Amino acid sequence: MSDTNIILEVKNLKKTFDDHEVLKDINTTVKKGEVIAIIGPSGCGKSTFLRSLNLLEVPTSGHIIYEGNDLTEKGVDVDKLRQSIGMVFQHFNLFPNMTIKKNITLAPIQLGLMSKEEADSKAMELLKRVGLSDKADSYPDMLSGGQKQRVAIARALAMNPEIMLFDEPTSALDPEMVGEVLSIMKELAASGMTMIVVTHEMGFAREVSSRCMFINEGRIEEDSDPVSFFDTPKSARLKDFLSKVL
């Protein structure tokens, strides 16, 4: 990789389920500090693409190169990879039988990254950052959807990731809770975190992202800065899509 700022490179990525090709020869790069919004119609492959980046979906063929290492090669330490590439899911994926603090500290302690004391301290620091320091001893079912998603963000940050992946992080939330999650994501973006976000939030994509990517039928059909993407789209399919969602 010639550009020293490139943290992630995707080459000829394909993913097939049975005989259905979901991703068709995806090629892109991600630079450190970029915030990339991935937009597209349902079933276009955008979530499959995102999940491939930390091997939650194993590519059928192609290469994902993170900091010079090809993640598609045999013998890749997936646990180590997921420390570096954090993930926030649509449905939070918190452990219901654990307190909020335990949800955050579990992985760093189990993987030997921190002592219990260090992990507890980090969890409280992160809960303060997402505005939930008073919920450390609560359980997930005591929290609203927006609060659960803020905890999920804190949990991902506890691993000190280089990249954060967000898979439609607000789409399962009641409308009045969307803002509290987006504000945390905006703060993360402003802090320099590299973020790749599959989203239906066009305002976030326009205002916060440095790049917008339109995936359609398993291909990247448009990839540009937000102003060009929204104001002068080149792809006819993107123009049609935006006319329906804006």
Predicted regions and their residues:
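C-terminal boundary and immediately downstream tail of ABC-type ATPase nucleotide-binding domains
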Residues: 214-217, 221-223, 227-246
